[in-house]
Structure formats: C-alpha cells, structure tokens
Amino acid sequence: MRITIIAVGKIKEKYLKEGINEYSKRLSRYCKLEIIEVEDEHAPDNLSSLEEQQVKKREAERVVKRLKEGTLLVVLDVRGSKMSSEELARKLESFFISGKSHVTFVIGGSLGIDKELLNMADFSLSLSDMTFPHQLTRLILLEQLYRSFKIINGEPYHR
C-alpha cells in the first residue's frame, strides 16, 4: 500500500515537524508513505476574489504536476465528507480492497483548494467543521491515517 500526501507549503514550526516525523515513522510499518511539498503562493490578506482564485489555481497546477497516474485522489476540503475515525478506516480499507494500492491525499494552501482540483478528486474529505492551519492539518491527517491502520489491523491504540 502506498500513501502520498501532497501539501501546499512548507512546515516551518519545529513542533509540527517533530509530530509529522513521528507519525511518518509509525506509518512506515503499514504503508509506503511519501510526503511531497509544493510551493505556496504569497497571498496577502487583502486579495480580491479573483486574485484568490488565481492563487489557488497556481497552487493546484503545482499539485497536479506531482500526481501519479492511477492514484486514487482524496482532497481535504472543509465541504468534504465528515467521518469518524472508524469510518475513515473503513473507507481507506475499501480503497485498498477495490484494487487501489496507491492513495494520494492533497492538502491545499491557506486559501483552500481550486475548484478544478476538487472536481478531479475521487473523494473529498473534511477532517472537522473547525478550520485548522494547513500545516497543522498535515499532522492531524497523519495521526488519523495511523489510527486507521491500527483499526483496520485490530490493534490497540484507538479508544
């Protein structure tokens, strides 16, 4: 099983890097994990709606260039499907059972994800009704993927 996470922007905070490294290490027991960072666009607070769309489009173009053919594409979006940890585990398991051995998760930049990239997705996932910084989202996703593999394998961790 292969999981790729394509994330817009670099992680700057040490505590996030440490958490991401820890869960990446834990996940290596269950899957081949690759994390790809693509450059984010500078986005001042006072962008017009059109400028925001242009920023998201440029970021999406960078993401699309890194997608591998045949991967199942899961985009993280606030309007995506909301799931419990158990439901996410079953969804992930169903991807692998259906013959999809490579799943790619995309985390957009601070402005979100371009609608064309959303339309390309096989599945859209929301981690919460709350809004998180996109850097923190990477750590939360990794923890939930680790939790999912523990659930799938019937191993202790999930409570």
Swiss-Prot record:
Oligomeric form and interacting partners: Homodimer.
Keywords of the record: Cytoplasm, Methyltransferase, rRNA processing, S-adenosyl-L-methionine, Transferase
Lineage: Bacteria, Bacillati, Bacillota, Clostridia, Eubacteriales
HAMAP family cross-referenced by the UniProt entry: 23SrRNA_methyltr_H
Protein name per Swiss-Prot or TrEMBL: Ribosomal RNA large subunit methyltransferase H
Keyword set includes Cell membrane: no
Primary gene name: rlmH
InterPro entries, A to Z: Alpha/beta_knot_MTases (IPR029028), RlmH-like (IPR003742), tRNA_m1G_MTases_N (IPR029026)
Recorded GO MF terms: rRNA (pseudouridine-N3-)-methyltransferase activity
PANTHER family reported in the protein's UniProt record: METHYLTRANSFERASE (PTHR33603), RIBOSOMAL RNA LARGE SUBUNIT METHYLTRANSFERASE H (PTHR33603:SF1)
EC number: 2.1.1.177
Organism: Acetivibrio thermocellus (strain ATCC 27405 / DSM 1237 / JCM 9322 / NBRC 103400 / NCIMB 10682 / NRRL B-4536 / VPI 7372) (Clostridium thermocellum)
Lyase found in the keyword field: no
Task performed by this protein: Specifically methylates the pseudouridine at position 1915 (m3Psi1915) in 23S rRNA.
Major enzyme class: transferase
GO cellular component: cytoplasm
Family listed: Belongs to the RNA methyltransferase RlmH family.
Localization annotation: Cytoplasm
Residues engaged in binding S-adenosyl-L-methionine: L76, G108, L127, S128, D129, M130, T131, F132
Catalytic activity: pseudouridine(1915) in 23S rRNA + S-adenosyl-L-methionine = N(3)-methylpseudouridine(1915) in 23S rRNA + S-adenosyl-L-homocysteine + H(+)
